[in-house]
Amino acid sequence: MALGETITQNVFGGLSNDFKKKNFSLYGQWISIFTIFLCIALGIANIFHFNLVIIFSVICIVQGLIVIFVEVPFLLRICPLTDTFTNFIRKFDGNLPRCGFYLLNAVIQWLSCTLQATSLIVVAIFFTLASACYALAYAKNQEYLKSSIDVTGTGQGGALEAQVGEHVVRNVL
């Protein structure tokens, strides 16, 4: 029980610290992490339509999986991925590239409304909000920051990327 409390305290403490910094890139990151869950859940929920919305629901699921790697970069180290994909994901390491990435994802999901109004509009709204946060961070010349959540309790904090210990080796065979 104590371990669960420690993890919860570290997560919510990091979340609280992130919002105190008033940096729009952190807001964009948190909106994007929430959007991952929306993409997967609503993509699966809308896959049962019997029209072309199925295409957009599959695209939504794929978008959610790609956003996981964009927002949680330590997964690039532990998952066996091609160097091409890894280099593609690393191109979005800044406010302006992420703004464009999320804007493109939003446009794709807004296009799903031309076929039928479904719950995919929620995904489009959240992609638009994430893009707007990164655009505001760029416009205000705010530094691109990563979350300071410390799930491990090591006190190192600083970026979801830093949470993988050095003992993890990317083994692609």
From Swiss-Prot:
One of its GO terms (biological process) is vesicle-mediated transport. Disulfide bonds: none annotated. It is found in: Golgi apparatus membrane. Glycans are attached at N23. Belongs to the TVP18 family. Golgi membrane protein involved in vesicular trafficking. This is Golgi apparatus membrane protein TVP18.
